[in-house]
């Protein structure tokens, strides 16, 4: 994004050895990039770390504060690219994985962003399979679609209730489970009369498969990043989760489907749009801007696309919760 913004060739970002044309940019003015502002106004660009870890992550790391802590922290920014930072005041490792747009409602038949009408939370009755949902918006708002946090809940609940198996296929029948002419299953959350659009709101096997791939990318990236410094999930003291996928993620459900490591739920903290918080900080404080440069200089980037073992870890993570159920003892107990 930074390359396109300042008009620099972005080709090196996607080609081996995946090194950006620049990491930081000083002295840029609004007039240089044709911003509708005072042409002499300074434009601050947060520094990149690697080809797929940009200024949004350095700004998010600043906001999360792991750079100033002794404890080991994991920072996760969920989006089309899942970006991670692990470390403390002594060191920081970063990487990025291609999660796709599922966390923001993309590649999901009834998916949408976390705006009015989005189903952002869901529970299912294990016996009747009846859903109870929470919808973004005013009281009485009918559902329009499902946002990222809602998708996490729905898939976790479908798996917990034995409605889908580890591959995300429907294995239990009921009034809410429908199948098309080809036998593909879907779970109906709201019928045509119950939705705000006059269309059925449901999640099907293709949607679930897309989301399993997205969560698999996140978990395998976490596992690879930790193993690169010879550490395990048990050594994580705090997990900061950022991203605009809803008003908050049900961390228990995210762990149950194998998206995050099975650590104590008290360690998780949802911090919303950390990139925006970091950008605000460097705009308002010269000291924060200096600290941002220090963060970038002290962060090591791990390129997952060329890292041995990452693809094997990804394939293993594309099940609910994982091919190795021993990694999720609490989730297995839940089921």
Locations of regions flagged by a protein language model:
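Non-transmembrane, aqueous-exposed alpha-helical and coiled segments at domain scale
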Residues: 70-73, 129-132, 222, 229-234, ...
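Gly/charged contiguous loops adjacent to phosphate- or pyrophosphate-bearing nucleotide/cofactor binding elements
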Residues: 152-214
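Glycine-rich phosphate-binding/hydrolytic loop that grips phosphoryl groups
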Residues: 33-36, 49-52, 56-63, 212-216, ...
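Catalytic phosphate/nucleotide-handling subdomain of diverse soluble enzymes
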Residues: 88-93, 97, 231-295
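Glycine-rich phosphate-binding loop of actin/hexokinase-like ATP-binding domains
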Residues: 3, 9-26, 47-48, 59-150, ...
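Short glycine/threonine-rich loop-to-helix capping motif typified by GTGT followed
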Residues: 1-10, 183, 231, 243-262, ...
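Nucleotide/phosphate-binding catalytic cleft detector across ATP-hydrolyzing
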Residues: 1-74, 203, 207-210, 306-335
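Phosphate/ATP-binding catalytic cores across multiple sugar-kinase/actin-like superfamilies
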Residues: 57-60, 212-234
